């Protein structure tokens, strides 16, 4: 292979200055290496290669990656069925249902609160959430579900004793009222407070009866006023006619002669 003389002289000079170096160093001359480009495959061969392409089989799925087999439905215990019946009876027989947060009350405070509410026939009911929530999901009270977070208790009564309940709960500030429903109408905490400001039912009934009585009396007066006035006018007309006839008959008769004076 030919070598360049200039390169050989260069290496000799470097050897004198730096020490021992190889005296000969091959240097390649000539054209560059030819880079072969990949030839485009004929379209028929492309089809054949695509058809005959090897498709490896899918690896077998480990049994641990498969979903577990469905478990048989769990049968409800007798306690769950009993609690479900109690919950259905509470929501069916009571018109007022209030939801409160079940905070950690002492036994004495809880007994005092229960006694104060029982005076007004308001009762405290506590049910587990895993039984109460499925009942609400399948009933018309499903909009109450957002109130049941954590531990809750229910204040129920057959009549809406909202004023008494709000007054008692104000004395227990650490027992928050979340909301509830009255006569199947959902109310918030502010709704209960506004409902408590309404007058009592007896007072409203008295005002209604008084208003109806006043309207009845006014209607009776209006119905009798015209006939009475017409009757009085007719009586006055008859009396005037009678007085006119009497005056006419008196003017038509001759005056009796004056009696002769005694001689």
Swiss-Prot record:
Component of the mitochondrial ribosome large subunit (39S) which comprises a 16S rRNA and about 50 distinct proteins. Belongs to the universal ribosomal protein uL10 family. One of its GO terms (cellular component) is mitochondrion. GO terms for molecular function: structural constituent of ribosome. Keywords: Mitochondrion, Ribonucleoprotein, Ribosomal protein, Transit peptide. It is found in: Mitochondrion. InterPro entries: Ribosomal_uL10-like_sf, Ribosomal_uL10_bac_type. The gene is Mrpl10. This is Large ribosomal subunit protein uL10m. One of its GO terms (biological process) is translation. The keyword Transit peptide applies. Residues 241-263 are annotated as: Disordered. Residues 1-29 form a transit peptide.
